[in-house]
Amino acid sequence: MSSVRALLAPVLAAVQVALGRLTTSISMKENISKLRAYKWSRVDRFKYGAMFVLAFFSITVISEPPLPWKLIVPILYTLALLFPISSQFILPSSPILLWLLLFYACRFISPSTRPHIWVSVLPTLETIWYGANISDILTRFGHPLLDILAWIPYGVIHFVAPFVVAALLFVYAPPGTVKVFASTFGFTNLVGVLVQIAFPSSPPWYELREGITPANYSMRGSPAGLARIDALFHGHGYTIGFTNAPVVFGAFPSLHAATATCEALFMSYFFPIKAKVGRWYVDTRILYWCY
């Protein structure tokens, strides 16, 4: 028991120090004074201007929930920025919140204004680069053990890792690191969604199911191999989630790859810890496995 306490003592001390850096002020005057004193650079004007345009576009396009209910989102966001106790979390997370807002709004963009869906580009590039259709080859042999091995990083760690990485950076990395991570994480995914809107491309499951027949925006998504996980655990979570996904034709760029890369880079930079496994040296870049 004493050994456990000895191990937890430095962790609890680090958490206590990190929590001590947080503000508990609820004074709106404090944030308003900071805003008035802030000197806006050209980069700030461009960044927040572009974010405002994208947020305005998203709120305008969204039809469910309708007016006035959808205005609750910007109202709550504005109120959260006014109080120091909440703005210290909301402001750095703004790129992430904007990415999620735009991602949700994609389902409401009129198909008549959207570009052509590219069905054969990615399979062709895959064949050129790898000499074969890797997606097709990987689906020829299946086993529940392989499904679980693929599901853990793709369907579980992918959604949990950002919070774990942010918590570790908050406790052990220099002050302000989490803000940089949140901005990088959010803008990376935000740019990814913008590319997906401008260059919609079909995912591997589409070729396996539909071939290279032309796609349209009325088609619904598919859980692909994750449907076997639903069947294995007698659930419907992945089937419902991916079938109703706002972005169906967003195979490029892969947001799974984006988040895994972002997490691996931050972790390997701030925690350059290596472990020897046989002849191999493994460090925190193994998070890229989440892709």
Spans of features found by a protein language model:
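N-terminal transmembrane-helix/juxtamembrane module of multi-pass inner/ER membrane proteins
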Residues: 2-73, 83-163
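Membrane-water interface at transmembrane helix exits
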Residues: 103, 107, 111, 170, ...
